[in-house]
Amino acid sequence: MSSPLECAKYLLSAHTTHQLPADDGSEVAFAGRSNAGKSSVLNTLTRQNALARVSKTPGRTQQLVYFTVTPQRYLVDLPGYGYAKVPKELQIHWQTFIDSYFHQRQALRGLVVVMDIRHPLKEYDLQMLAYARQRGLPAQALLTKADKLGRGQQAQTLQKVRNELTKHFADHINIQTFSSKSRQGVEQLHTVIETWLGLARLA
């Protein structure tokens, strides 16, 4: 059976909260530092190579990008963060926008925080997970580019990050490895997101 996420289509890009769709559906947001592989995750999940643009210049995503899965069910690509070439004023605008989104958006059903498995749990990652915790939302910590490490190193990093997350958030954050290249962890993430959005598998 194919995943309903494969039906995703671009809907809109929003620079302010006023441009967001009506707040009466269900949506899952994807957050991550610039160059963590967020666009590749979205493209892999949907089996669409060009759904989310993979920029050669990290930090270019300057808005919330909405993709429609089914009517009133969305995937949301949040602005990448933490890249030095982005002007300070723009970083402040993003932060204000993201703060407002997390505190006001009732349609939000869950958060996927994308982290490069070689550089996990930066300050921004913890901040995003804290947002989810404060709202009582489920969150999935995604250790991407897992193919860059051997199985032993993957397991070691996974356990280390799990211990750190437990210290900060008790057992409220789920964690998994993921690779767009080998498709490792794709089915696991499909299941998580489909459950959050209340989607049924397509025969």
Curated annotation (Swiss-Prot):
UniProt-listed Pfam families: MMR_HSR1
MF terms in GO: GTP binding; metal ion binding
Superkingdom classification of source: Bacteria
GO biological process: division septum assembly
Cofactor or coenzyme needed: Mg(2+)
GO cellular component, one term: cytosol
InterPro entries in the record: G_ENGB_dom, GTP-bd, GTP-bd_ribosome_bio_YsxC, P-loop_NTPase
Residues reported to bind GTP: 32-39, 59-63, 77-80, 144-147, 178-180
Gene3D superfamilies attached to this UniProt entry: P-loop containing nucleotide triphosphate hydrolases
Domain EngB-type G residue range list: 24-199
Binding-site residues for Mg(2+), renumbered to this chain: S39, T61
Listed SUPFAM superfamilies: P-loop containing nucleoside triphosphate hydrolases
PROSITE patterns in UniProt: G_ENGB
Keywords assigned: Cell cycle, Cell division, GTP-binding, Magnesium, Metal-binding, Nucleotide-binding, Septation
Function summary: Necessary for normal cell division and for the maintenance of normal septation.
Family: Belongs to the TRAFAC class TrmE-Era-EngA-EngB-Septin-like GTPase superfamily. EngB GTPase family.
PANTHER family linked to this entry: ENGB-TYPE G DOMAIN-CONTAINING PROTEIN (PTHR11649:SF13), MSS1/TRME-RELATED GTP-BINDING PROTEIN (PTHR11649)
Name of the protein in question: Probable GTP-binding protein EngB
